[in-house]
Amino acid sequence: MSWTVFAQQLTHYSQQPFNQVLINPAFAGNAACAEMKSVHRAQWVGLENAPKSTALAITGRLGKPAKDRLSVFHGFALKFENDRMGPFQHNRFHAGYAIHLPFKNEHFLSFGTYFGVDNINFDNSNLHPLQSDPSIQNSRYSFLAPDFVFGTKYNTKKLFFALAFQNFVPLDYPIGAQSKKVFHANFSSGAQFELGKSDWTFSPMINVRKALRTPIALDFYSIFTYRQDIYFGLGFRNQESLLIMARFKVFGRFKVGYSFDWVLNSLRGGMAHTHEISLSISACKERKKGATICPVFE
């Protein structure tokens, strides 16, 4: 018997459209003010040792405010993520920087990096395998490794394309015989359409994830937004689940979100569905009500 650390090595968030900075450092400083974003995800609820994930990011702009919309500006992000699954606990700490290069008509090309550390903890004291494995018997490990993420994005007021490369530093974990940290790529794209003369907008989005030696994972989203205050979305994760999400602005500077993943694969027999909640806090001043200004989903 051998262990591969985290068949799902990196968390995929159902509410990624609202929390891109958790994946891609090129989104650091995207908003014109400081923001805090947090997510808690309980995956496959009802299954023993099912994954649970928590993430927190603080992001903002560096330096003096841009003089105009054709000025280069810089962003920063500080991020912490914690994943727990059975005997494993995975902590990631990152500090990020992004540069945003403007073009005419409010087109931006951005590049960002995260530098940080991965901490993998393994404790099999509560693990009861069917067959004894000497490589993990009475094992407790704590492993620290450097981590690097690179991201880029291109956006206008109506669409965006973003690409992030994660687990850039390939390493072997000292847990079992086949425990490796593998390279991941994450691509997302979306657009925004105003629905007539109303205050509603419609934003389709796609997210594509690929890790070495694994099938491509696809998420499709359809998100409706009213006056930057109310968001409703439907999604589909290929061969895995249907997604339903809602997000509301409360008390001016807070946005609270919830998503539910209705599992379609073999886990459905155990009704092992997934719940995710999010909270974001923005220091931005209130803008004039109306359609959202960018499909990056601030």
Residue spans of the language-model regions?
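Sec/Tat signal peptide C-region and signal peptidase I cleavage site
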Residues: 3-7
